[in-house]
Amino acid sequence: MTKRKKRAAINLTRLPIEYIDWLSRPIYRFIHIESAAGIVLFISTLLAVLLANSHLSEEFARFWQISLGMTVGDLVFERSLHKWVNDAGMTLFFFLIALELKRELVLGELRNPQLALLSIAAALGGMSTPPLFYLLLQYGESGQHGWGTVMATDTAFVIGCLALLGRSIPSSLRIFMLSMAVVDDIGAIFVVAIGYGEAVDWLVLSYALLGFMLVRAMAFLGVRSLVLFSIVGGAIWLVIDMSGVHPTITGVILGLLTPTNKWMSRQHLFIIMEALVPSSPSQQWSGDKREGEILKTAAAAARETLSPVERLEMLLHPWVGFVVLPLFALANAGVSLTSVNLTSPITLAVFVGFVFGKPIGIVLFSWIAVWLGIAKLPENLNWGMVFGGGMLAGIGFTMALFISELAYNPDQINAAKLGIFIASITSALIGFLCLRYFAAREKQKRT
């Protein structure tokens, strides 16, 4: 076969390329860079701080207070743009986090019980120890109720830092960090739903439980339509919101209920494709109705070789990483530097909780789990890298800002945000340097 024929055969396996594809391809490539979402999130944060301290600060604050909603009969669903981003947008974020955890537990590395228990133990340490450090400084004080702020880890920024380290760190560390951060975030959102919600209407909440049972029944019966699941999920979100429980918990529960089974195996797909596609390139589709139905069957078969969890992850990753989280940063990260007080007890408590509580809790609980024999360190991972990972987990940013909006009074939020910023920057720098150092030492030992 000549080179020209080979090239033609290869091109036949690709989709046609239009001018718009040449323009959009660089954007598409950027979106799929692992650290890209972290970069966009950082730029959004910087922009929010700049706008909050510019002559446009009042207009910027008023923009997020624009009221949006709808009325259905006697029911009124209305809230500020800021609240829509925090409540509805972050529900999508937590839904994606729960999908990632479900996939890892059923299809990924966390199928190994000892590796899963190490991540769970580390997450428990990362959730429980920082609030203790925080309360050591704030118990009985005005900021006591903000203990939940220091519980969670910003998964997007952690992914960005790990991507910057590249191949200098082992893949086992990446898996450990991401699974720990996901478990950490899910634990934190349960605390938010219970600890920072309003008075609970248990009757209304029972309707939400019926909704979750309906979702489970739909999955059991083999319903595959993501549109139907989205409609039911949206209804559950509204019911939970009316019950007094924070509605973002909807995302976590729905994510964990999402099926991981594939309707169509790849072998089955190949058999269908061989039967449907003309055997010779010279054969032409006539374009009649029957052949149109055949093509629809082939498209459905190709789509269903991915589980609902995988399909939803692929669909939501760009939207969450490049729309939801940047909007959240713009809505919440604006700190007025004119009113900053570096000596605020709340700022100090948040800083200590993240920078000291996170690494100590993660290392301590991980060590206890390994010592008890219920977990083991993955290959190529040492305790120095676990400590460095614990420092990176002190980047609380997105999650911490989210919880701080619920936990503090308006006159305390600026102090909490400042503590979050300083702690996140400190944790990122120390964690990055520690991981580079300990990863290099581990490589030297093995050579």
Curated annotation (Swiss-Prot):
It is a multi-pass membrane protein. Keywords: Antiport, Cell inner membrane, Cell membrane, Ion transport, Membrane, Sodium, Sodium transport, Transmembrane, Transmembrane helix, Transport. GO terms for cellular component: plasma membrane. Gene3D superfamilies: Na+/H+ antiporter like domain. GO terms for biological process: regulation of pH. PANTHER family: NA(+)_H(+) ANTIPORTER NHAA, SODIUM ION/PROTON ANTIPORTER NHAA-RELATED. Belongs to the NhaA Na(+)/H(+) (TC 2.A.33) antiporter family. Na(+)/H(+) antiporter that extrudes sodium in exchange for external protons. This is Na(+)/H(+) antiporter NhaA 2. The gene is nhaA2.
